[in-house]
Structure formats: C-alpha cells, structure tokens
C-alpha cells in the first residue's frame, strides 16, 4: 500500500505541492489527472525521492520513503518512466519491460500484458517504434 499524507514540496522557494494526500491500495490502478502545472509530475517525483518533501509523510508497504535514496525506493518496486520516454530505444518492448521486473516480484509479463494488451501485440517491436501513448 502507498500512502501520501499532507506532503508539501518545493522547487527552490516555489511552493508547488500544498498538502497532497492519497492512498493506493494493493491491486489498485490510479491515474493522476490535472491541467499543466497542477503538480502531477511533482507528486510522482516526491513519492520516488527525486524531490524531498519539506513536510508530510510517504509510506510504501508500511515503510517511510521520505529521506530514502532514489535507488532504495526503486528497489522496493517504485519507479517512473519519464515524460521524455526514458526507454532503451534499441531494445524490444518486452526487453524494456523485463528490465523493470525484479526476480522477487509477484508480477509476471502476462500480468503486465493483461493490463496493457497493446504492448503484448507490440512486444517484439523496438522501443523507439512505440507512439507516445504506448
């Protein structure tokens, strides 16, 4: 379970997130929606430790995340594919996905393909062949 409780994050002196809270239960799929500048990316960056919130708490499976290093958070299974399509262009879609799956993960490729059937259809294509929405 992921819990974000009243986080406040800044870019220098600019107070970008003001009291954001959310809970994601196991098995839930959550989407952050909002206009440009609403704080969607900053919320994700705060959860992943890219930005350290100045106030509030973030917990993943009961463990506090605020103050942990980015790689420590990633080892727990939290990651972000950046807006600039940070994938390996010459690897296939499936190879890109397999990089993200840990050996100890309960997730299997069929689980991912079940959620994103279009990726299964394109699994042998090079990563650079995907459209932005894929």
Enumerate the predicted regions with their spans.
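Short coil-to-helix segment of the ABC ATPase nucleotide-binding domain corresponding to the Q-loop/switch region
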Residues: 90-98, 123
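Conserved structural motif at the start of ABC-family nucleotide-binding domains
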Residues: 2-4, 17
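Conserved ABC ATPase signature
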Residues: 126-130, 134
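Short beta-strand immediately N-terminal to the Walker A/P-loop
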Residues: 30-31, 80
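The feature captures the beta-strand-to-loop junction immediately N-terminal to the Walker
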Residues: 33-35
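Helix-to-loop junction immediately C-terminal to a conserved catalytic motif
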Residues: 48
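Conserved ABC transporter NBD signature motif
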Residues: 56-64, 76, 106-114
């Amino acid at each position: 379970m992921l819990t974000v409780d009243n986080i406040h994050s800044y870019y220098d002196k600019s107070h970008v997130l003001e009291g954001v809270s959310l809970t994601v239960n196991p098995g839930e799929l959550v989407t952050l929606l909002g206009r440009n500048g609403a704080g969607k990316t900053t919320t994700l960056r705060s959860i992943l430790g890219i930005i350290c919130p100045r106030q509030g708490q973030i917990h993943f499976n009961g463990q506090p995340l605020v103050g942990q290093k980015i790689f420590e958070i990633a080892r727990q299974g939290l990651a972000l594919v950046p807006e600039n399509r940070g994938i390996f262009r010459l690897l296939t879609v499936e190879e890109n996905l397999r990089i993200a799956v840990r050996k100890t993960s309960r997730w299997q490729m069929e689980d991912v393909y079940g959620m994103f059937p279009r990726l299964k259809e394109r699994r042998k294509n090079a990563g650079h062949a995907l459209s932005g929405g894929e």
